[in-house]
Structure formats: C-alpha cells, structure tokens
Amino acid sequence: MQIILLEKIGGLGNLGDIVTVKNGYARNFLIPAGKAKRATEANMKEFEARRAELEAKQAEILADARVRQEKLDGQTVTVAQKAGVDGRLFGSVTNADIAAAIVAAGIEAVKANVRLPNGPLKAVGEYEVEVALHTDAVAKITVAVVAATE
C-alpha cells in the first residue's frame, strides 16, 4: 500500500515521503496512529496544503525532544533491587523500572523509549542505556543497579 508519511519514522522515511508498506502495517498501525495517510490524489493535495503546518509541528516536537535529551545525557539513574550475595538480582531491572526512575528524577520518559539491547538487567552494576526521545534525539544515560537495603 502506498502511503504519505506525516512524520519521520525510523527505517521508513521522512515527513512527506511516499512509501510502500504492507497493508496490515498501514491499516493497523500507521494510519490509526496518525503517522500516515493513504497516497490518494486528494490526500496528496491536502498534504501539500498542510505541509508547512506539519513541518512546524514536527520541528517543535524535535526541539522539545532535544531539550529533554540535553537534560538526560550523561545522567546517572539509580535503581534499587533485591539482590543475593553474589550480585545477581532476584528478578530483573526492566525498561519500565528505568523509565520510572527517570520520571522520579523529574524528566518525562516512557518505558517504550528505554532501549535495553541485551534485555533486562540481571546483576548489580552500572550499565549504559539509550533513551530514544525521538528518532533524531537519543540520550545515553548510566543506570546504576544497587542492592536494596531493607
């Protein structure tokens, strides 16, 4: 299915690009989320009429993400979790735990933005984690996992 992208989508294209995607991806995700429209003549004309408005909106979203990225870059977030004497955790630290710690530090974050390339953290220590605030604004933070004291 041919669609017009209404915002930049990683791995797919930029605002205004006409791309071909699978029907299910377009119908079930991109179009309902407001990220794309079908590439019909009427929609193309409507998009061209609203292009400046959409570009300004995307620039504002990116600027907000860059401000949050500057606040987050290089920060250390501490997460306390029960651990054994050998340093292994009872359970694990997930992206939801890290997002909650970032929010507790006063910066807006969602668990879907936290990237853990090797899966959940399962041992005490310090880990480098990426927080994708936007496709063009990715902050690198240090997560210090410590043993919880009771």
From Swiss-Prot:
CC annotations in GO: cytosolic large ribosomal subunit
Keywords: Ribonucleoprotein, Ribosomal protein, RNA-binding, rRNA-binding
Gene3D superfamilies with a match to the protein in the record: Ribosomal protein L9, C-terminal domain, Ribosomal protein L9, N-terminal domain
Protein's GO biological process: translation
Molecular function GO labels: rRNA binding; structural constituent of ribosome
Family membership noted in the UniProt record: Belongs to the bacterial ribosomal protein bL9 family.
Chain's role: Binds to the 23S rRNA.
Listed name of the protein: Large ribosomal subunit protein bL9
Species the sequence originates in: Neisseria meningitidis serogroup B (strain ATCC BAA-335 / MC58)
Gene name per UniProt: rplI
